[in-house]
Curated annotation (Swiss-Prot):
Name of the protein described by the UniProt record: Nuclear migration protein nudC
Keywords recorded for this protein, A-Z: Acetylation, Cell cycle, Cell division, Coiled coil, Cytoplasm, Cytoskeleton, Microtubule, Mitosis, Nucleus, Phosphoprotein
Coiled coil: 60-134
Organism: Mus musculus (Mouse)
PANTHER family given in the database record: NUCLEAR MIGRATION PROTEIN NUDC, NUCLEAR MOVEMENT PROTEIN NUDC
Primary location: cytoplasm
GO biological process, one term: nuclear migration
Post-translational modification: Reversibly phosphorylated on serine residues during the M phase of the cell cycle. Phosphorylation on Ser-275 and Ser-327 is necessary for correct formation of mitotic spindles and chromosome separation during mitosis. Phosphorylated by PLK and other kinases.
Sites bearing Phosphothreonine, chain numbering: T108
Residue intervals of the CS domain: 168-259
Modification Phosphoserine, positions: S136, S139, S261, S275, S278, S286, S299, S327
Similarity field: Belongs to the nudC family.
Locus of motif Nuclear localization signal: 68-74
Basic and acidic residues: bias regions: 75-97
Length: 332
C-alpha cells in the first residue's frame, strides 16, 4: 500500500465530501459503496466473494494501524503523566522541606580560636583564587564590561534572583520553569490530609486561582502569559502540598513572574542549562539552541549565527568575483 504522502493525496477532496454528509461517517461510507455499485463493476466484475474479501482485508489493515496508533498515543500520554507526577513530587518535596533550626553548641576558647582561624584561612584562599582568576589589573575592555554590567544591574535593581529552577521561592509558594512549562507548589499548614474537595484550583488561559475552600486564595491573579488549559493539571502531594503544572503557549520566553502581582525575577540571571531541552520538540529545541548560541556570541562580541551566514555568503561572492574592488564598500 502507498506511503503516507500517497495516502494524504486525496485528503482535501475527501474532507470536502465528508463535510457535506450530515449523517457523518456512516453516510459517507454508504455514498462510496453506492458509487462503486453504480459506476463500477466492483461487486459483480470478479469471482464471487472477491469484493467482500478485499473489503475485509482493507478494513483489517487499517484497523491494525489505527489500534497501533492508539496504543502508541496511550503510551506517550502515560509517560507524560508519569513524568509530570514525578516532577510534581520532587517540587512538592522541596517545598515541604523545612530548614532545620540552628543548633546551639557552646565552644571552648580553644575551639572558637581554631574555628575562627579556619574561617580566615578559607576566606584568604578564596580571595587569592579570585585574584588569580580575574587578574590583579583591570584592562580597559574589562572595565567597560563591568560598567555595562553595573548599568544593567541598575535597571534590574530590586528584582529577585531566580531559584535553581529558574523561578522564585516566595513566602507562600514556590514555582519553577522551563521554556515550555511551569510548575507551582503551594504548601498548606493544615492538621489534616488534604483531599480534592478541600481545595480550589481554577486554571484558565490567563488566570490562576489556588487555595482552600472557604479561605482566601493563596494564588489569585492574572498569569504572566497564556497557558494551554487542556494540557495543564494539578494534584495533591503528601496530603499537604498542591502542585500545579502549566503548559506555556509561547515556548520561546522566560516568565519573570507567575502572576502579575508577584515580584519580578531577573530573567537575565536565568540558567538555560537548568531547563530540559529534551522536553522540547525538535523545531523548538533547534530555535532555543540557536538563541542560546547567539546570546553567548553577543556576550563575547562575536558575530551571531545569522551574521556568520551573511559573512560566508559575502566572502563566497567576493571570491567568485576577483575582478571587483570591494575596498571602498561599506557593509552593515
Amino acid at each position: 500500500m502507498g506511503g503516507e504522502q500517497e495516502e494524504e493525496r486525496f485528503d482535501g477532496m475527501l474532507l470536502a465530501m465528508a463535510q457535506q454528509h450530515e449523517g457523518g461517517v456512516q453516510e459517507l461510507v454508504n455514498t462510496f459503496f453506492s458509487f462503486l455499485r453504480r459506476k463500477t463493476d466492483f461487486f459483480i466484475g470478479g469471482e464471487e466473494g472477491m469484493a467482500e474479501k478485499l473489503i475485509t482485508q482493507t478494513f483489517n489493515h487499517h484497523n491494525q494501524l489505527a489500534q497501533k496508533a492508539r496504543r502508541e498515543k496511550r503510551a506517550r500520554q502515560e509517560t507524560e503523566r508519569r513524568e509530570k507526577a514525578e516532577r510534581a513530587a520532587r517540587l512538592a518535596k522541596e517545598a515541604k522541606a523545612e530548614t532545620p533550626g540552628p543548633q546551639i553548641k557552646e565552644l571552648t576558647d580553644e575551639e572558637a580560636e581554631r574555628l575562627q582561624l579556619e574561617i580566615d584561612q578559607k576566606k584568604d584562599a578564596e580571595d587569592q583564587e579570585a585574584q588569580l582568576k580575574n587578574g590583579s589589573l583591570d584592562s580597559p575592555g574589562k572595565q567597560d564590561a563591568e560598567d555595562e554590567e553595573d548599568e544593567e544591574d541598575e535597571k534590574d535593581k530590586g528584582k529577585l534572583k531566580p531559584n535553581l529552577g529558574n523561578g522564585a521561592d516566595l513566602p507562600n509558594y514556590r514555582w519553577t520553569q522551563t521554556l515550555a512549562e511551569l510548575d507551582l507548589a503551594v504548601p498548606f499548614r493544615v492538621s489534616f490530609r488534604l483531599k480534592g474537595k478541600d481545595v480550589v484550583v481554577d486554571i484558565q488561559r490567563r488566570h490562576l486561582r489556588v487555595g482552600l475552600k472557604g479561605q482566601p486564595p493563596v494564588v489569585d491573579g492574572e498569569l504572566y502569559n497564556e497557558v494551554k488549559v487542556e494540557e495543564s493539571s494539578w494534584l495533591i502531594e503528601d496530603g499537604k502540598v498542591v502542585t500545579v503544572h502549566l503548559e506555556k503557549i509561547n515556548k520561546m520566553e522566560w516568565w519573570n513572574r507567575l502572576v502579575t502581582s508577584d515580584p519580578e525575577i531577573n530573567t537575565k540571571k536565568i540558567n538555560p542549562e537548568n531547563s530540559k531541552l529534551s522536553d522540547l520538540d525538535s523545531e523548538t529545541r533547534s530555535m532555543v539552541e540557536k538563541m542560546m548560541y547567539d546570546q553567548r556570541q553577543k556576550s563575547m562580541g562575536l558575530p551571531t549565527s545569522d551574521e556568520q551566514k551573511k559573512q560566508e555568503i559575502l566572502k563566497k561572492f567576493m571570491d567568485q568575483h576577483p575582478e571587483m574592488d570591494f575596498s571602498k564598500a561599506k557593509f552593515n
